[in-house]
UniProtKB/Swiss-Prot annotation:
Residue runs in coiled coils: none
Presence of the UniProt keyword Cell cycle in the record: no
Name the UniProt record assigns to this protein: Large ribosomal subunit protein uL29
Gene Ontology biological process terms from the UniProt entry: translation
Species whose genome carries this gene: Jannaschia sp. (strain CCS1)
Domain of life: Bacteria
Length: 69
């Protein structure tokens, strides 16, 4: 998921996306621990997508704070 796609979403949609990514990361960790994971690169991809979502959320929060001031 690209940063531009994330910037087009609302903060509520981003929070939902972050929740879904955290759940997926949790499941992937368990799959890795039990040796059932097929695509190990997906763990890295999910972790980076979550970081992108958090970054965009922080950018939107800062922009909203500056707009109020």
């Amino acid at each position: 998921m690209s940063a531009q796609e994330l910037r087009d979403k609302t903060p509520d949609q981003l929070r939902d996306e972050l929740t879904a990514l955290k759940k997926e990361a949790f499941n992937l960790r368990f799959q890795q621990a039990t040796g059932q994971i097929e695509n190990t690169a997906r763990m890295r991809q999910v972790r980076r997508d979550a970081a992108r979502v958090k970054t965009i959320l922080n950018e939107k929060a800062a922009a909203a704070a500056n707009a109020e001031a």
